[in-house]
Amino acid sequence: MSETVERHEFGAEVGRLLDLVVHALYSDREIFLRELVANAADATDRRRFEALTNEALALPSDARVLIAPDKAARTLTISDSGIGMSKEDLAQNLGTIARSGTRAFSQALGEAKGSEGEDLRPSLIGQFGVGFYSAFMVADRVTVTSRRAGGEEAWTWASDGKGSYTLEPASREQAGTDIVLHLKEDADEYLESYRLDHVVRKWADNIAVPIAIRDAEGKEEAANRGTALWRKPKSEITEEQYKEFYRTVSHGFDEPWATLHWRAEGALEFTGLLFVPSMKPFMPVEDDRRSKVRLHVRRMFITDEAELLPNWLRFVHGVVDTDDLPLNVSREMLQSTPTLQKIRRAVTTRVINELSNRSKNTEKADDYQKFFENFGSVLKEGIYEDFERRAEIAPLLRFRSSTEGGWTSLPDYVSRMKPEQEAIYYLVADDVEALKNSAQLEGFRARGVEVLLLSDHVDAFWPEQLGKFEDKPLRSVTQGSADLAKLKPEGEAAEDAPALDRLVAALKLALEPDVSDVRVTDRLVDSAVVLAASGMGPDLQMQRLLRRAGRGFGGSAPILEINPRHALIRSLNDRAEAGEDLKAEAGTLLDLARVQDGDTPRDPVAFARAVAAALAGTVAKPAESA
């Protein structure tokens, strides 16, 4: 090997990724061309944009993506005149990938089935940003020769996809990239111009950068129309064309749940073509905070980092195109341009209005609920992050409920409130089933009071930020037990409760400082104990999240509430009256309340022993002799 050739091992995760891509997506191999062509077009767009502020980077007049099959050499070359890559870029972009990305990709492969059983694995490639590696589905060796625009050196990256790659100096007259695929024996179809033309027209027809295919005689034929679909009148666009464009910008295989195509005219003029997906992406949308809307100026791609929509609408894909911005504005200046800020507000309002109209369509309530199941957790972030839009977002939210079988909304909840009910009650936990069985609900159910059941991670944060809805305060049931005294239980009156002063005093003494208070409650029916948040500070679920994040919680300890009508509490009260030491039993009660609330016992071993002793009857004996 030449001394100038550097050999590098792939990051450990790249080898695993290559194996996943090659074997899991083998039957959909044609998507490799979609990914490589899309990357080449993006590189061309990025060079065009950078040239606006640096004339030395100007694109050549014949800039295009060129696809050139060579039957004699059994190679397929994809070339562009784009921004190119330096030696460091090649190593970083093609030699490493985040460990978390590979793990998420692997998990998603196993779950890639649509609602009707269709195979959705091909859509994973683009969503996880691993499109380049799809080349190894058809090639047993890949070489990439690239020269960075503005740079003097070219470098070649080469690999057989089996654990390592090489880097060596190369020669390229102009900036750009050549990707050469040395095709496998079973990939002959990608040496045929007609097959390549079919794939490009299927997957890349709307890419604005010209794409050409060179045949065996050296003749080049245009392979894409490159039309700016969003600039055409809606009446001239078919549903199938909308779907194809959506799949191009989203890298998905589903159909759009909503298509928004409009032109704003007047003081501010722009065109928007946006899509709301009908399926949740495989990469958790909560984690993927990248913008999905591209900014174009006079049809020219400028950036996908303009944040044309707020983070809480990041599930929306599409394009916004305007003539009201200069072509040569830098990305840094772009963020503070008043025109762009106005476009952001207008585009956000348009999306909210669309969601609002659909949420009010009672004939298609199931359709909106499906959307909310996919993206509701992200939409809720808007309550927390966007003060100006909270009032608009709140009616769009949907919730499970302690009394309703399906989903409900805040307006519907308010319409069902009891006359004497002062607040909108909610309970937060990690999953809906735990919520439905929570002891926290017993007193509210006994009084026929509806409680909203919240199980998304963000649900611990946004209710406090919203504060009120239609002048009704939002209140966690872990903080709202005192309100129950104002509401009468339904059905027969409960039996009188015994006085528990001695037991309460004993429990307080035994449990300090783990609880801030012990008190008798009327909100329990079947359970012996429950935890409540103190009057000051966040509710219990927020406290748990803070502890899990290692941030601690400096507020008051929780309150332990006991049910005076429960047999266990009555038995312990008798023992307290008799002067017994109840320190061990007090600890078990607190741990029992913690477990009921989805938390862990303070001392799991001691708790397990106490439960085992109870099952053996050792706890019950004093009660039997009383």
From Swiss-Prot:
GO terms for MF: ATP binding; ATP hydrolysis activity; ATP-dependent protein folding chaperone; unfolded protein binding
Subcellular location: Cytoplasm
SUPFAM superfamilies from the UniProt entry: ATPase domain of HSP90 chaperone/DNA topoisomerase II/histidine kinase (SSF55874), HSP90 C-terminal domain (SSF110942), Ribosomal protein S5 domain 2-like (SSF54211)
Region annotated A, chain positions: 1-331
Pfam family, one: HATPase_c_3
GO-annotated cellular components: cytoplasm
InterPro entries: HATPase_C_sf, Heat_shock_protein_90_CS, HSP90_C, Hsp90_fam, Hsp90_N, Ribosomal_Su5_D2-typ_SF
The entry's keywords: ATP-binding, Chaperone, Cytoplasm, Nucleotide-binding, Stress response
Region (B), start-end ranges: 332-544
Purpose: Molecular chaperone. Has ATPase activity.
Subunit structure: Homodimer.
Classification via PANTHER family: HEAT SHOCK PROTEIN 90 FAMILY MEMBER (PTHR11528)
Family of this protein: Belongs to the heat shock protein 90 family.
Protein name: Chaperone protein HtpG
Provenance organism: Methylorubrum populi (strain ATCC BAA-705 / NCIMB 13946 / BJ001)
Gene: htpG
